[in-house]
Amino acid sequence: MNAQALVLTDNAANKVRQLRDSEGNDDLMLRVYVTGGGCSGFSYGFNFAESVNEDDAEFVNGDVKMLVDSLSYQYLVGSVVDYVEGLEGSRFIVQNPNATTTCGCGSSFSI
C-alpha cells in the first residue's frame, strides 16, 4: 500500500495530539474506517487504537499516526482526513475523491 495514498492534515494531527495528551497516552493512534450504512450507503468511522493490526496501513503526520484497515483502504485511497470546527460542531471529516455522492452531514457516501 502506498504510504502517500491518504493524508492526515495538520489540523487533524493537532486534534489527535490534543486528545492523546488529555488521555495521557502517547500510544493512541487515529483509526479511520468505512462501514456499511448511512443515507448514502457507506459511513466513515473514527476511533482510537493503541496497537496496529496486521492488515493496517499507517499514515503519519509528525508524531501522529493514522491507521486504515485493508477493507476500508480501497474506499479511502486518495482521501484527506481533516478536523473542522464550525456551526455544525467540531469533527473529523474525510474529503474522498472516490465518493460519487455524499449526504448533507458529510459522514455518509456512495461510490
Swiss-Prot record:
PROSITE patterns: HESB. Pfam families: Fe-S_biosyn (PF01521). InterPro entries: FeS_biogenesis, FeS_cluster_insertion, FeS_cluster_insertion_CS, FeS_cluster_insertion_RrpA, HesB-like_dom_sf. It comes from the Bacteria. One of its GO terms (molecular function) is 4 iron, 4 sulfur cluster binding. GO terms for biological process: iron-sulfur cluster assembly. Disulfide bonds: none annotated. The keyword Hydrolase does not apply. Keywords: Iron, Iron-sulfur, Metal-binding. Binds 1 iron-sulfur cluster per subunit. Its cofactor is iron-sulfur cluster. Iron-sulfur cluster binds at C39, C103, C105. The keyword Iron applies. Gene3D superfamilies: HesB-like domain. Belongs to the HesB/IscA family. HAMAP family: Fe_S_insert_ErpA. Homodimer. This is Iron-sulfur cluster insertion protein ErpA. It comes from Acinetobacter baumannii (strain ATCC 17978 / DSM 105126 / CIP 53.77 / LMG 1025 / NCDC KC755 / 5377).
